[in-house]
């Protein structure tokens, strides 16, 4: 996780730069009100930099204004704030991965299979990919863009796709398994591809397929995002057909580099490539 990687990177930076880095981590518990209160407490305690995985990406202005009033840089990550909010202050930043890229790479994984093993993928031979979609939490930017771009990638390549069903499984393996179980009962072998916004939901789909007695040869073509260890194991086993690596290590390293440079030097590190003076973009890998 990003939290674990941040703790690791902080220790490495302490040793490399002979300085003390204190990390204070709080859980907003999906409540923007609670998160705003936590930011207030951090500012009152005089922390040097605040990093925020914002609950509601449209509500960043409040936090940016609080940070500016206190003169404390704020780094958003994971959920990208609205651009206008980020530009309210020169020391508000975003570190993350373009969410649409993960969807594009998922689409390309399916396209590769369509080109190389079409007879296997196109079960009913109609020249159309029948798919189901397991989405993350409703309204989450990553979920919306991954969902949009995986399908637009197919369309841009001239491949027709038909959505049989979709459901918001909130990134959860258990919820995804329940949805997939229902779809298997309803659509059976007509499901050719399962797009999952993350690996946990992809694994939930695999769980449901296994419960239904399907082996890896008879399961749909299932793809996820994150390249988690359990997903990589499923990839080796052949039940998961593809995943996209979400660079938690690179995210943590970039956040820490930016936070330390802002704290020590008052400006972003020259080692970081800033886009529009606000954004540090990382990349997904399939």
Predicted features, each with a name:
Residues 1-18, 23-38, 45-47, 53-57, ...:
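Extracytoplasmic "Venus flytrap"
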Residues 2-16, 102-107, 141-160, 175, ...:
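Short, solvent-exposed amphipathic alpha-helices that sit
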Residues 11-18, 84, 113-126, 157, ...:
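Alpha-helix termini
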Residues 12-28, 130-133, 155-173:
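Short beta-strand elements in bilobed, periplasmic/extracellular small-molecule ligand-binding domains
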Residues 35, 94-126, 176-179, 227-231, ...:
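Hydrophobic alpha-helical segments within soluble ligand-binding/sensing domains
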Residues 39-45, 49-69, 74, 145, ...:
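Hydrophobic alpha-helical
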Residues 63-101, 117-128, 228-236, 240:
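Flexible loop/hinge segments that line or gate small-molecule binding clefts
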Residues 127-138, 250-286:
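Hinge/cleft segment of the Venus flytrap/periplasmic-binding protein
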């Amino acid at each position: 996780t990003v939290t674990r990687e941040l703790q690791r990177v902080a220790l490495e930076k302490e040793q490399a730069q002979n300085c003390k880095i204190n990390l204070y981590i709080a859980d907003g518990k999906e409540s923007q009100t609670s998160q705003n209160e936590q930011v207030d407490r951090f500012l009152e305690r005089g922390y040097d930099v605040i990093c925020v995985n914002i609950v509601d990406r449209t509500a960043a202005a409040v936090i940016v204004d609080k940070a500016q009033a206190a003169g404390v840089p704020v780094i958003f990550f994971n959920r990208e704030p609205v651009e206008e909010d980020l530009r309210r202050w020169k020391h508000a930043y975003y570190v993350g991965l373009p969410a649409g890229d993960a969807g594009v790479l998922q689409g390309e994984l399916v396209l590769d299979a369509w080109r190389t093993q079409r007879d296997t993928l196109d079960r009913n031979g109609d020249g159309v990919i029948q798919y189901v979609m397991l989405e993350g939490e409703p309204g989450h930017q990553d979920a919306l863009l991954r969902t949009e771009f995986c399908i637009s990638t197919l369309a841009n390549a001239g491949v027709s796709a038909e959505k049989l069903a979709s459901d918001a499984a909130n990134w959860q393996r258990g919820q995804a398994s329940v949805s997939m179980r229902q779809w298997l009962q309803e659509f059976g072998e007509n499901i050719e591809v399962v797009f999952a916004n993350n690996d946990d939901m992809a694994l939930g789909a695999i769980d449901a397929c296994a419960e239904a007695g399907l082996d890896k040869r008879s399961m749909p073509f299932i793809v996820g995002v994150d390249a988690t260890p359990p997903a990589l194991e499923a990839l080796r086993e052949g039940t998961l057909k593809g995943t996209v690596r979400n660079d938690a290590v690179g995210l943590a390293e970039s956040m820490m580099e930016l936070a330390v440079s802002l704290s020590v030097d008052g400006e972003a590190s020259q080692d970081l490539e800033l886009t529009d003076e606000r954004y540090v973009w990382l990349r997904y890998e399939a």
